[in-house]
């Protein structure tokens, strides 16, 4: 792949700034990505990038759950032409332990240097996954981190107001985790007799109607 001289120059300069942290970097599809090995270094590294390479804007914080990464609901092979696909089958979900199941991703922008980078880190598995908040560096991280907490259940240390932001406060679970059922755990409706919204257990079967297919 041909990499522009300007992009390579940015990559080399940032790599030099982060040389003491054992950070791995690459340029792929015209984008710069750096991977942090130790999640305890996230705040320090991002602070260094903001100060020394003028990444004054944090455009996004998100996460990925790799629990079922590489697993296919339908096996695509020669047998398919003989038996076809089985539609609407019951979901056979396995929650096997996965090393470094979650990865957190930060998107940074330096308008002064006209460059964007991605910084990511695989998080150690624990009962409570905790990452240092960067809301003190970029105010925009406040709601973005709340969304990651709400959707993935990742906690942010020193966050000023870590509450759910997309689901209601009594919501059970975290919807973007791969082991969260597509139907959810409860459903809500308005009860005319009670004059309020009530929560009831979901009566819909958890089925795979649109399977994920991984083609080789």
UniProtKB/Swiss-Prot annotation:
Matches recorded under Gene3D superfamilies: NADH:ubiquinone oxidoreductase, 30kDa subunit (3.30.460.80)
Catalytic activity field: a quinone + NADH + 5 H(+)(in) = a quinol + NAD(+) + 4 H(+)(out)
Membrane topology: Peripheral membrane protein
Annotated keywords: Cell inner membrane, Cell membrane, Membrane, NAD, Quinone, Translocase, Transport, Ubiquinone
Entry function: NDH-1 shuttles electrons from NADH, via FMN and iron-sulfur (Fe-S) centers, to quinones in the respiratory chain. The immediate electron acceptor for the enzyme in this species is believed to be ubiquinone. Couples the redox reaction to proton translocation (for every two electrons transferred, four hydrogen ions are translocated across the cytoplasmic membrane), and thus conserves the redox energy in a proton gradient.
Subunit structure: NDH-1 is composed of 14 different subunits. Subunits NuoB, C, D, E, F, and G constitute the peripheral sector of the complex.
Name of the protein described by the UniProt record: NADH-quinone oxidoreductase subunit C
Name of the gene: nuoC
């Amino acid at each position: 792949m041909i990499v522009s001289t300007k992009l390579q120059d940015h990559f080399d300069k940032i790599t030099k700034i982060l040389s003491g942290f054992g950070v791995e970097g690459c340029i792929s599809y015209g984008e710069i990505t750096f991977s942090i090995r130790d999640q305890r270094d996230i705040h320090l590294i991002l602070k260094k990038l903001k100060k020394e390479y003028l990444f004054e804007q944090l455009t996004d914080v998100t996460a990925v759950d790799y629990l079922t990464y590489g697993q296919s609901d339908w096996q695509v092979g020669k047998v398919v032409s003989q038996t076809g696909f089985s539609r609407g089958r019951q979901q056979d979900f396995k929650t096997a332990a996965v090393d470094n199941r979650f990865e957190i991703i930060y998107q940074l922008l330096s308008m002064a240097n006209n460059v964007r980078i991605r910084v990511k880190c695989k998080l150690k598995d624990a009962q409570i996954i905790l990452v240092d908040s960067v809301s003190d560096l970029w105010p925009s991280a406040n709601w973005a981190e709340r969304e990651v907490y709400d959707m993935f259940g990742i906690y942010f240390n020193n966050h000023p107001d870590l509450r759910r932001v997309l689901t209601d406060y009594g919501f059970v679970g975290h919807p973007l985790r791969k082991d969260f059922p597509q139907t959810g755990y409860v459903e809500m409706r308005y009860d005319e007799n009670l004059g309020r919204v009530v929560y009831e257990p979901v009566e819909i079967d958890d089925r795979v109607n649109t399977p994920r297919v991984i083609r080789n």
